[in-house]
Amino acid sequence: MACNDGDMEVESISFENSDILSCRANDTAVDFLYKYNQKQALYLTIPAGVLENKEKTVTGTIPNNYKLYYRTFSDVVSSSYFCNTIYPASPQITFNSEATGGTVTIATRPIYNENTGALLRYDHQITISNLVLLKEDGNKLVESNLVFGTYQTNKQ
């Protein structure tokens, strides 16, 4: 991030140490996934049925099949913020940017117990290539390969 006349300006997106979360933990029936870090968040909407517990790779485009939002907040945000039907009054969203382009790839693979061979879970690795976001100054921020992360679902 860079400072410009007292305003925070986004130069790159980094959520490397943030887990992917949903309001229905470890469930494939989700319509959005999110990750947050202090006063910022990424919010990805996904089509119904795209997460399945079977090995496959799916792709889609932003803003057609998927939507991605980058948000900053007036104060530290918690996971409970995202699961409310109506967002709470605090913290306030201070900046909201909807991505205007990008390709979302979700690679799903089963994870097995190394000793017994029993199926443990499914990992859904989500990457976004050629992501385009508008910054507060109106300029574009382009991330050629954003690793959104791995969302895990139960084996059922």
Language model: regions and residue ranges:
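Generic structural hydrophobic/aromatic packing signal, biased to beta-strands
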Residues: 3, 44, 104-106, 128, ...
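Surface-exposed helix/loop patches within compact recognition domains
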Residues: 29-121
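Compositionally biased, intrinsically disordered low-complexity regions
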Residues: 8, 51, 62, 103-104, ...
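Bacterial Sec-dependent N-terminal signal peptides
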Residues: 1-26
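Edge beta-strand at a domain terminus
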Residues: 124-156
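A short, compositionally biased
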Residues: 25-30, 127
